[in-house]
Amino acid sequence: MEKLAASTVTDLACVTAINSSPPPLSPISEQSFNNKHQEEFAASFASLYNSIFSPESLSPSPPSSSSPPSRVDTTTEHRLLQAKLILEYDELNEHYELCLNRLQSLMTELDSLRHENDSLRFENSDLLKLIRISTSSSSSVSPPAPIHNRQFRHQISDSRSAKRNNQERNSLPKSISVRSQGYLKINHGFEASDLQTSQLSSNSVSSSQKVCVVQTKGEREALELEVYRQGMMKTELCNKWQETGACCYGDNCQFAHGIDELRPVIRHPRYKTEVCRMMVTGAMCPYGHRCHFRHSLTDQERMMMMMLTR
């Protein structure tokens, strides 16, 4: 510091001497004097600049008032965390808007489906009314079941339990088949007639026929039944009633709701006497319970099938 002060005083003296008015000179030496004066001024200014701004002071040094590195790192992490949270918030906001738009579209679709369901319900009710009207008109023409048929149905119903649960409904037969020689007569008369004759005599062909059924051993008298052709009303059990115990058509249904309503069907004399070839080959019969051949196998037939497969 003492050296700096001394140099400063010296420099100030030089500056004072330089700034002082020079003595009057001759015109010849005035130019050389000015050059010398400028050189001295530059040298004194350089020494003054070096004394004030030393090279050591120009070297970079960390400021004394700067914050510690740990504090700077904490601030940076905090800012990065805030930026990350802002990005996550933007993503959640976009996802929320997408979900809201999807919900609105689903609500619109639900409303359209509800209106469509209402219109279909009205159309279904109209169709049910038409079906009831048509079935009521057709049922009014069909004759009531005779007394001897009722007696036969009561004999079948008495052999079963009075409670009609699901197991009992599933065990009921789909139809009551009566093998008779009259089946051949009916088919022969129907095939021999032409189309016009069949249209005129459709009532006589499709009407019922009385046949005698030979009872089991121990019963001497044969039972006279009134049988119907396959496909007529109440000749087959209602699938809906057999599954759930109820039918949406009620009394207007063309199928039987129980063994009491089931009408006997006249069949070929050899109906269900031979085994279905589809069952022998191990395939499923497409006709199901309507097949005219037997689907149940005896022990002897099972043994023969096992021998054939070997």
From Swiss-Prot:
Which keywords, in A-to-Z order, does the entry hold?
A: Coiled coil, DNA-binding, Metal-binding, Repeat, Transcription, Transcription regulation, Zinc, Zinc-finger
- Which residue intervals are annotated with compositional bias (Basic and acidic residues) in the record? 155-167
C3H1-type Zn finger ranges: 232-260, 270-298
Highest taxon of the lineage: Eukaryota
**Does this UniProt record's set of keywords contain Zinc-finger?**
yes
Output the PANTHER family linked to this UniProt entry: CCCH ZINC FINGER/TIS11-RELATED, ZINC FINGER CCCH DOMAIN-CONTAINING PROTEIN 14
Q: What is this protein called?
A: Zinc finger CCCH domain-containing protein 14
Native source species: Arabidopsis thaliana
